[in-house]
Design a protein with these regions (language model features):
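G-domain G4 guanine-recognition motif of GTPases
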Residues: 84-85, 109-124, 145-153, 158, ...
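Conserved nucleotide-binding/hydrolysis micro-motifs of P-loop NTPases
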Residues: 62-63, 86-90, 105, 114-119, ...
Length: 635
């Protein structure tokens, strides 16, 4: 169990831990000279013989060091709120309590300290103050223990309360990747660099490779301590010290706020969707795009908050919001965060991360807001997935979901209605019903294209995607088309897509001109006439021949030079025969085989290069065996 202190300056937090554990805090010279805690202190103790070690994090109480307090409050299991009997509830008591409640720390104990300085009536007054303070929140029933670090009064009662809490604390799940928010980094003679922090998820073992810091530098775990004891592995919920090694690893490159992560989780982000709450004691509403300090893990970064459901947020209210940060952070769903004002002098509120990879567009669309509300109300991936899919026309990236929830895909239990669609850029998740619903409109739009362009065989894939106005990314759209082609709902002729029964209808003028020109091309063999030599308006002939090329009946080798499809196939067969004799084909060999001049032969070969039949190697050619033309041509 990890216990963190909280409370106003000079209320006796450090002295209380010393009385409880027998270990001195405030080990830094400056802290001893000034008589107050400035940075985080760490203690470990057995609260009774043979008990598990309990870790204690002693935080500073002065408002100037609240940023240090926030770094220590992340990941603790129980907060020990200390209120001095002589002072009573003070400003930092309020702020620290607000912070630990916003962080969602599950348990609290309250120590009314310095009881040796006051009478019992004063202790009772402070008890009532504390009860009033705690009443609206999650710690309303927290035990209150009056004690004195000087006389020892109440220390044993506190010890027993902590032991009972330790027995009841739930072990954090070790599922998911390892995450450590670094709060200290130092060098040990003979060992090297050591970093410490609370393991927030997963587990780590000696020999593991992790990614460190903003650059994601690979480091190896040479050794580790868990709860201040040498160990071979450590688990989520434990205080961990890791001895790291890596090439050119320098202490000055590691700072509080850096993360140590399993490789699969490394995904820095500067845009996060959150469920935000403004503290009820705030004097004014929070405005859209207001600048803030954001404390997440042990990081302290600046940015702005874009409110997603209104122009302002009233004190005590909640709202969906998007963080736009100036520095990359690491986060997963459910991570708590604290928001402080631009000057870092006052805590404004906090929230929970919903999506660490928030979109840049459509962030306020009804579909996106529905997804975010589902994330607020659902704890697990399986719970929220149906709502996420129901409000997504473009599918969900399973790799991104695995990072968002810190859940390896092997642990997912997908609903029956979920389909995994393979695309050229990786798999996507769709609800089966929504995926099927995307098909009918596409077929209907293709039919509409045929009505508008009856003299065309059909559009290619990209033109059809533009024509339909599809919001699907190109790889996903192609996967949808592939299914329609496989099912026979759509057919293809070369690159052109069409309905199975579609027949091109030329206009009467085009039909008459084609009947006149077609014999000329067939009779010309490998040396067809140029457009200018066909005896008709060049623009009209050119438009018709390009139309016939889209139908697959002609091939435009160069501008104004077209070959019939059967001639291209004969030329392909001759090229394949040459390749049988020698896989590397010389221009001269092809020229001699077809009986044309060198210039025309090169024009034909360059056309074959463009359509993927051949690969150019200087002035030679090699057949691409995966070419559809090569595979479907007999020779």
């Amino acid at each position: 169990m990890i216990v963190g202190t909280a409370g106003h300056i000079d209320h006796g937090k450090t002295a209380l831990l010393q009385a409880l554990t027998g270990q001195a805090g405030d080990r830094r010279r400056e802290e001893r000279e000034r008589g107050m805690t400035i940075d985080l202190g760490y203690l470990y103790a057995e609260l009774e013989a043979d008990a598990q070690l309990t870790g204690f994090i002693d935080v500073p109480g002065h408002e100037r060091f609240t940023h240090n307090m926030l770094a220590g409050a992340q990941g603790i299991d129980l907060v020990l709120l200390v209120v001095a009997a002589d002072d009573g509830v003070m400003p930092q008591t309020h702020e620290h309590l607000a912070i630990v409640q916003l962080l969602g720390i599950p348990r609290a104990l309250v120590a009314i300290s310095k009881c040796d300085r006051v009478d019992s009536a004063r202790v009772q007054i402070v008890r009532e103050q504390v009860r009033t303070l705690l009443a609206p929140g999650a710690y309303a029933d927290a035990p209150l223990i009056a004690l004195s670090s000087v006389t020892g009064e109440g220390i044993e009662t506190l010890r027993q309360e902590l032991l009972q809490a330790q027995r009841e604390v739930q072990q954090r799940s070790t599922e998911g990747g390892f995450r450590l928010a670094i709060d200290r980094a130092f060098s040990v003679a003979g060992a090297g660099i050591v970093v410490t922090g609370t393991a927030l998820s997963g587990q780590v073992a000696v020999g593991d490779t992790l990614l460190l810091g903003p650059q994601g530098k690979p480091v190896r775990v040479r050794g580790l301590h868990a709860q201040n004891q040498a160990a071979g592995h450590a688990l989520a919920g434990q205080r961990v010290a890791l001895n790291l090694s890596a090439e050119r690893l320098a202490l000055e490159h590691i700072h509080r706020g850096h993360w140590l992560l399993a490789a699969d989780l490394y995904a820095p982000t500067q845009r996060l969707d959150i469920d935000m709450q403004l503290l009820p004691g705030e004097p004014r509403a929070f405005e859209h795009f207001q600048p803030v300090h954001v404390h997440l893990g042990t990081q302290d970064v600046t940015g702005r908050v874009a409110l997603l459901e209104g122009a302002s947020l009233a004190p005590g209210e909640r709202m969906l919001a998007q963080l736009l940060l100036n520095t990359p952070v690491h986060a997963v769903k459910g991570d708590p965060l604290i928001l402080r004002d631009q000057s870092a002098q006052r805590t404004l509120g906090g929230g929970r991360v919903l999506d660490p990879f928030a979109p840049t567009r459509q962030r306020r669309s009804p579909e996106r807001l529905a997804q975010l509300h589902a994330l607020v109300n659902s704890a697990t991936l399986e719970d929220v997935l149906p709502a996420l899919l129901a409000n997504s026309d473009t599918g969900l990236d399973p790799q991104r979901l695995a990072r968002q929830f810190n859940r390896p895909r092997s642990s997912w239990v997908l609903p029956a209605d979920v389909r995994l669609i393979d695309t050229r850029q990786g798999p996507l998740l769709f609800s089966a019903s929504r995926w099927e619903a995307l098909k009918s409109p596409l077929v209907e739009q293709l039919a509409r294209f045929h009505e508008l362009e009856p003299d065309q065989m059909g559009p290619d894939r990209d033109r059809l995607r533009r024509f339909t106005g599809s919001t699907l990314e190109r790889p996903t759209f192609i996967s949808l088309l592939d299914e329609l082609l496989a099912s026979g709902d759509i057919a293809s002729s070369g690159p052109w897509l069409h309905l199975p029964g579609h027949q091109v209808r030329l206009s009467e003028e085009d039909e008459a001109l084609w009947l006149e020109l077609q014999p000329l091309f067939e009779q010309a063999g490998f040396d067809p006439p140029w457009v200018r030599n066909l005896g008709h308006d060049e623009a009209t002939v050119r438009a018709l021949l390009r139309k016939m090329a889209r139908l697959g009946l002609m091939h435009q080798v160069v501008r104004d030079l077209f070959y019939p499809d059967n001639m291209i196939r004969r030329l392909t067969a001759m090229l394949l025969q040459l390749a049988d004799a020698n896989p590397v084909i010389q221009v001269a060999a092809f020229r001699d085989a077809v009986g044309l001049g060198r210039k025309r032969s090169i024009q034909i070969l360059e056309y074959f290069d463009r359509i993927g039949l051949t690969r150019r190697l200087g002035d030679r050619r090699q057949i691409r065996l995966d070419s559809a033309l090569a595979q479907h041509t007999e020779h």
